[in-house]
Amino acid sequence: MMTQVGLQLYTVRDHLEKDFEGTLRKVAELGYKGVEFAGYYGRTVEQVQEILQETGLTAIGAHTPYNRLKEALEEELAFNKTIGSRYIIVPYLAEEDRNRWPEIIEDLKTFGERCKAEGLVLCYHNHDFELTLQHDGKPVLDAIYEQVPESLLQVELDTCWVAFAGANPLEYIATYQGRLPLVHWKDLIKKADGSPETVELGKGEIAITAIGDAAVAAGAEWLIVEQDYCAGDSLDSIKTSMEWVRAYANKGGNLHV
């Protein structure tokens, strides 16, 4: 199956708050094939289904906070199954959770078992701290994927954060090939103070062409565009990023756009 291009909706959260349906229509018009949710903005499961059907967008999955999975896993599983979403993704771990990896790993196994039983797939989405912090003598990210079986946890690799952490995203794609359905495609510049500023695809320092090539070669189902913060209008940002994606595809990038 050819790799498709989706959008992590966190990118356009300001617009979703004001006009959820209109924003999803715009995302579809721009050429994104699927969306990864980060909240549903008070919409019912029926309302989400309706706008997905209208726009033809695929529900790729949902970034679902770790604590929400602890408290309301069954509810989240039911919602995702109903809208046709396949992936439940742990998006982020708060600072206070980053010193209790054995417990987190056991929780991921539990979540993964329940997802699997319902025909869904649990993924983990990294930032930079999973590469800079260690557990059992290796980067946390590697420890998680080593200690939670592949059958219970798949990889959503945020290649931009891997690069920002000083690791090699191409090596990580190669390492987790076959376990890597989702790849976040993101660009950034490192500011003078060393902090990251996310920018539109092609405007930053990340090797996004090589990452796209590697993700496609590794059999990723989705390359998911994400921009954590947009300096201008977020809808303009996702338009600019899609223009870069189309140019990439026109130059031979093997993508369905």
Regions found by a protein language model. Give the residues of each.
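Active-site-adjacent beta->alpha loops and helix N-cap segments on the catalytic face
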Residues: 40-51, 99-101, 107
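Active-site beta-loop-alpha junctions enriched in small/polar residues
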Residues: 8-12, 38-40, 64-67, 92-95, ...
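Active-site acidic/histidine proton-transfer and metal-coordination neighborhood
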Residues: 34, 66-154, 162-164, 235
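Conserved beta-strand positions in the central sheet of alpha/beta enzyme cores
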Residues: 6, 36, 61, 89, ...
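Short glycine-/small-residue-rich flexible loop motifs, especially phosphate/cofactor-binding loops
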Residues: 24, 49, 77, 112, ...
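Domain-start "cap" segments at the beginnings of catalytic or binding domains
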Residues: 36-39, 44-45, 58, 67, ...
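Histidine-acidic metal/acid-base catalytic patches
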Residues: 1-29, 53, 81-84, 135-137, ...
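Short acidic, glycine/proline-enriched helix-loop-strand junctions
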Residues: 44-63, 111, 118-120, 241-243
